[in-house]
């Protein structure tokens, strides 16, 4: 089993401030013992600097610990470029949701030391440019949105067919 969005496991919160390499290793060992194989450790919306620090701790644990390296296939960054609207923001703190910028996206990716494998963002101001950054890296995931496609044009995931 591969879990593409795991916020923590068996009492270890990957979004906890100061989570240690030892705690991350314990979570990985428990995940394996319960039948899991690989996972993407997920960091959710918060202040940009807080998210970067959390991503950095996960990357450091991956670099320092062979068990973590074996289990954690990478990092999934969920937010902060998501919709702040009720019903869409989910469990994310709406006060930390922000429009996407390439600089902010690059800050989060750099903190991951090459381990950011997936990012979730919603359409909105700056999302096209930040999304192109994802596509150029060869990875992209979708988020729900309140956006509606213009009349006569396809929605998310559609493509124009010649003919």
Cite the ranges covered by each PLM segment.
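Histidine/acidic residue-rich metal-binding segments in metalloenzymes
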Residues: 61, 97-163
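Divalent metal-dependent hydrolysis catalytic cores, especially in the metallo-beta-lactamase
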Residues: 7-13, 25-54, 70-84, 112-126, ...
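Generic structural signal for well-ordered alpha-helices
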Residues: 28, 52-59, 105, 130
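Flexible glycine-/small-residue-enriched beta->alpha junction loops
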Residues: 78-100
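Active-site mouth loops of central-metabolism enzymes
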Residues: 8-22, 90-98
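Metallo-beta-lactamase
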Residues: 2-6
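Short acidic, glycine/serine/threonine-rich loops at helix termini
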Residues: 51-53, 85-91, 130-131, 152-154
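A glycine-rich helix N-cap at a beta->alpha junction
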Residues: 60-62, 66-72
């Amino acid at each position: 089993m591969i879990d593409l969005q795991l916020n923590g496991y068996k009492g270890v919160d990957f979004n906890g401030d100061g989570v240690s390499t030892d705690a991350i290793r314990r979570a990985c060992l428990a995940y394996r013992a319960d039948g899991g194989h690989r996972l993407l450790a997920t960091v959710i919306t918060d202040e940009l600097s807080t998210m970067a620090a959390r991503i950095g701790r996960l990357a450091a644990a991956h670099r320092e610990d062979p068990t973590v390296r074996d289990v954690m296939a990478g990092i999934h960054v969920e937010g902060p470029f998501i919709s702040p609207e009720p019903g869409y923001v989910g469990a994310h703190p709406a006060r930390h949701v922000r429009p996407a910028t390439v600089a902010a996206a690059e800050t989060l990716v750099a903190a991951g030391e090459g381990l950011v494998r997936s990012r979730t963002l919603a359409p909105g101001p700056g999302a096209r440019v930040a999304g192109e950054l994802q596509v150029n890296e060869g990875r992209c995931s979708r988020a729900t949105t309140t956006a509606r496609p213009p009349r006569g044009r396809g929605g998310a995931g559609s493509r124009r067919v010649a003919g």
